[in-house]
Each structure stands twice: as C-alpha cells, then as structure tokens.
Amino acid sequence: MRWPRGLTLAVVLLTAPAGCASSGDERPEAPAKPAQGSPVAPTQVSPSPSAEPEESDRVEEPAERAGFHGKIDALPAALAAEIRGTTWKPGCPVPLDGLRILHFNYWGFGPAVRRGPMVVNAAVADDVLWVFEQLFDARFPVKRVALATEFHPARFEQHRRITSHRSVTASFNCRPVVTPLGPGDDYSQHAYGLAVDVNPLQNPYVTTDGFVRNRAAEPYTVRSRSLEGMIHEGDVVVRSFAAIGWEWGGNWSGDKDYMHFSLLGR
C-alpha cells in the first residue's frame, strides 16, 4: 500500500467538523503502488447515454499526447489574486500558501488526451498527482479537470433541481458542506483541499429516497450500468484513492456521494 503523505494531517484534522457521516463498511484492499511504467488494467466502459454539449471552459493543451505528464507548483501570484474573494476568502481553514496547483494530462471522453489544473492542499499534492497518474495509465475517462467556481448558497436551496451537463473534476473550494437539504454550517473537506470530486455528472449525490439534484444525472443513478466516466466499487479510481488513504462517498451508509473522495472519508 502506498504510504499516504497526508496521514499526519488526517490525524490533526480528526476533530474538524464532519460534512457527511461515512459508513462503517469495510473498504476494499488497497493496491500497492504500481512499479514505474506498469499500467493499471484498462477500465471497460460503454458510451454515454446521450451526447453532451461541448463545454465552453478553456482547456489546456497536453504537454505530450503519448504519456502522463504532471507537475506541482506553488500558487502563482496571479492565480492567488484571482481566487481571493471567490473560491478562497479570509477565514478559510487553509491559507493560500498552504495550497498547491497541479497540472496533469488525463484521458478525456472521446477518448483524447487533455490537460487540466487542480488546486489541492500542499500536504496531499504528491498523493493526488499519483492517483491521476494511475487513472491515466488505466485510460479511465475524465470529462474535464478544471478549477472550482465560486460557491453561491442561493443556487443550492433545499431540494432545488437543475439541469446541467457540466461535469468538472475539481478539489479545493472554500465552501460549506452541501446536501439536497441545502448548504450546511460546517466546512466541506473541499475547503481544506482534502477532497476531490470526479466526474460529478456521471457520479451524482443520491439520497436514500433516490433524490438527485441534477436531472441530467438521472441515467447514472442506476449504478449497475457501465457508462463512460462512472465509478464502481473496486475499480481503478476507488483502488487508487484507497492506496493513498482516501475514502469514497459511494461507500457511505445512507446517502451516496459517488463523485466524492476525501482524506477523512467525509
């Protein structure tokens, strides 16, 4: 098992407010870190149930098209200024200098190699980059990797439904926990840069009574299906995050957050 660099941080944060209760279910055996250049077995997927409109968000050009390339940097001054007052605000539980920006290649839908940025906590930057290297080697499709957008509480009123084909894989966002009941009072693990949401459209948050906020995600509520970008128990996504000590919201008791992986399992 890959030794999680964020383990000490997890111990420190055990007293942090919980966003959602995680289950006591046993997790699958985590894989050992593959030897350099040894790919994880490819994930077999079926086409999406319907074509999605092309997103207008800017896409970075891959550094190389043939292999995985990733890097970790301190937040550039321009980016720090850009997110100040939007996804980061004074009083957030992690300072700006406690964050890092990753840039890495990933397999998009299609498939095609794309490249995107992700902001995470500095303590877990190496581990998160390693996870996305495993996903790249397995050719697991990621719809889009991009920075999170500013959280607006009014958009998350209790049981308010939306229709959106946007599906952005992202991490840091200084915001509260959000459920179908609306925003909570506690910080989400995203506010610490210790959580990643992968393909949110294809892996929605589903309540125990079957409520899904995004109507466009309804085809993905049947978790026995194998549609492009879906995450399943024991697959390369779950196993790779487990190898760095992170837990999956798809294993929660009660509500399921199929997109969500976090260091503290909540």
Regions found by a protein language model. Give the residues of each.
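Active-site acidic/histidine clusters and adjacent loop/turn architecture
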Residues: V94-S164
